[in-house]
Curated annotation (Swiss-Prot):
This is Chorismate synthase. PANTHER family: CHORISMATE SYNTHASE. The gene is aroC. Its EC number is 4.2.3.5. InterPro entries: Chorismate_synth, Chorismate_synth_AroC_sf, Chorismate_synthase_CS.
């Protein structure tokens, strides 16, 4: 089974991603990972930290000469800002006198509404929010994006598919309504300042960000992830835990600041009658055809051959320049929340992180379905299955 885990803190020496269960022969280089991490840094409305918090990638194990070996994979994403934080974030004990002179070591006792600060301090018994925010930070997603680079390559090699995303809306901007983008549109989407597929939508989103910036505020939005060309039958209806839509929802909700997920037309489907909610089928020259894709490529917890389409709603960033009211946990008195460097809007980057989680989950489901110890073996298993499906549909 494909499994992943990350370790590290926002201002620690590095983030580490571990990926276990990936087959041998997946083609990935350090440059490939760096490319995906650079995409994660895209987006109008990002803070100044994006300019100097570079991602230095080191593949520690599981890869030789650009191909996976079949064993556990470890990737380190170094923090170029580490020298500034080495004393504050040292894993070993530090003399109190050294810490006293460090402005960065000032206790953070005023939790930010909407952040993990308050609950984390109480749950783990911390007097300071620093240990909470260091791990809860969205910086951790860099490690997930690194791990997902292997899943993306696996899906490309076995199925010939690409994972892509685009921003549907930011703040109160009019949501994009139109055709789903394809892999050939990805470069144009990444070239957009807000990773929008539509120029008019892009202008509306930028205007929203500019207004929020002037007001000392932050914005959330909605992103959509799309994969064209997946085979029928990834996932299962056998149990709730096996349903691919449930697994995708869990993975997307596990991204920092994501507060809602929908598959296909999702919540809008609940407003329709059944005759207008489902995707009718008809015979075609090469199999079953659908006139719509309201289900987002998933029925009964399984892929149905249509484009996989899922959306995630991101709340506004909780580090608000116009600091929100809170309580100082050291005194119990009214206060304003702590404010550190932050973005006005990170929705474009959230799309790249959402791609990563979808890639990991879909690759996991693909390996469960087709097995194998190498790309060649998994591909052969898939092609045999695909031939059988095609033969059934040709009857």
């Amino acid at each position: 089974m494909l499994r992943w885990i990350t370790a590290g803190e926002s201002h620690g020496p590095a983030l580490v991603a571990m990926l276990e269960g990936m087959v041998a022969g997946v083609e990935v280089t350090s440059e490939d990972i760096s490319t995906q991490l650079a995409r994660r840094r895209l987006g109008y409305g990002r803070g100044a930290r994006m300019k100097f918090e570079a991602d230095k990638v080191t593949i520690v194990g599981g890869v030789r000469h650009g191909r996976t070996l079949g064993g556990p994979i470890a990737v380190e994403v170094g923090n170029t800002e580490w020298p500034k934080w080495e004393t504050i974030m040292s894993a070993d004990p530090v003399d109190a006198e050294l810490l006293a002179d460090q402005a960065r070591n000032a206790p953070l006792t005023r939790p930010r509404p909407g952040h993990a600060d308050y609950s984390g301090m109480l749950k783990y018994g911390f007097d300071d929010a620093r240990p909470v925010l260091e791990r809860a930070s969205a910086r951790e997603t860099a490690a997930r994006v690194a791990a997902a680079t292997f899943a993306r390559s696996f899906l490309r090699q076995v199925f010939g598919v690409e994972v892509l995303s685009h921003v549907i809306s930011i703040g109160a901007s009019d949501p994009y309504v139109g055709p789903e983008p394809t892999a050939s549109d990805l470069a144009a989407i990444d070239a957009s300042p807000v990773r929008a597929f539509d120029k008019a939508a892009e202008e509306s989103m930028i205007a929203e960000i500019e207004a929020a910036k002037r007001d000392g505020d932050t914005l959330g939005g909605v992103v959509e992830v799309v994969i064209h060309g997946l085979p029928v039958g990834l996932g299962s209806f056998i149990s709730g835990a096996d349903r691919l839509d449930a697994r995708l929802a869990s993975a997307l909700m596990g991204i920092q600041a994501i507060k809602g997920v929908e598959v296909g037309d999702g919540f809008e489907t609940a407003r329709r009658r059944g005759s207008q909610a489902h995707d009718e089928m008809r015979p075609g020259p090469d199999g079953i055809l659908r006139s719509t894709n309201r289900a987002g490529g998933l029925e009964g917890g399984m892929t149905n051959g249509e484009a996989l389409r899922v959306r995630a709603a991101m709340k506004p960033i909780s580090t608000v320049p116009r600091a929100l009211a809170t309580v100082d946990m050291s005194t119990g008195e009214e206060a304003v929340a702590i404010h550190q460097r932050s973005d006005v809007c990170a929705v474009p980057a959230a799309g790249v992180v959402a791609e990563a989680m979808v890639a990991l989950v879909v690759a996991q489901a693909a390996l469960e379905k087709f097995g194998g110890d190498s790309v060649a073996e998994t591909t052969a298993n898939y092609e045999r299955y695909a031939s059988g499906v095609a033969a059934r549909l040709a009857r």
